[in-house]
Amino acid sequence: IALPSFLNQANKAKQSEAKQYLASINKGQQAYYAEKSAFIESVDNIAKLGLGIKTGTSNYTYDLGESDVDGKDGVHAWTKGSGNGLKPYAGLVYLVEADGALTSETALCEAEDVAADPTDIAAPTVTGTAADVRNCSTVAGYTIAL
């Protein structure tokens, strides 16, 4: 009876890795954009963010891609592959206009369910307005805002 509870706690600990990695990537993307006016859109260039993180661990494999929110540039990072029983996650950084200037916002989204094929999780499809993205309501496959 205690084994399912233990496994659930173990998966929560593993999933916290994804949340921490994606939050770090989001912050790194914001800093990079502030300095270079561009985002890193390929996992091959993730070292340019200066985070010192790997693109894969025993729990998750991470990837990057470009997004468009309200017709403005953005980027997303997601857990492309995961261990069995682990939920997929996506982090997004996107530009919004505030007081006549562009600024960046972030979102961290969780999938409702464990992926059917944890070795090949599709990139999040991002549509809608910044407000929609902020609460993950238009990030296909990811519905829970963290």
Predicted regions and their residues:
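Amphipathic alpha-helical segments typified by the pilin-like N-terminal helix
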Residues: I1-A34
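Periplasmic/extracellular, small/polar-rich flexible segments of pilin-like filament-forming proteins
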Residues: A34-L146
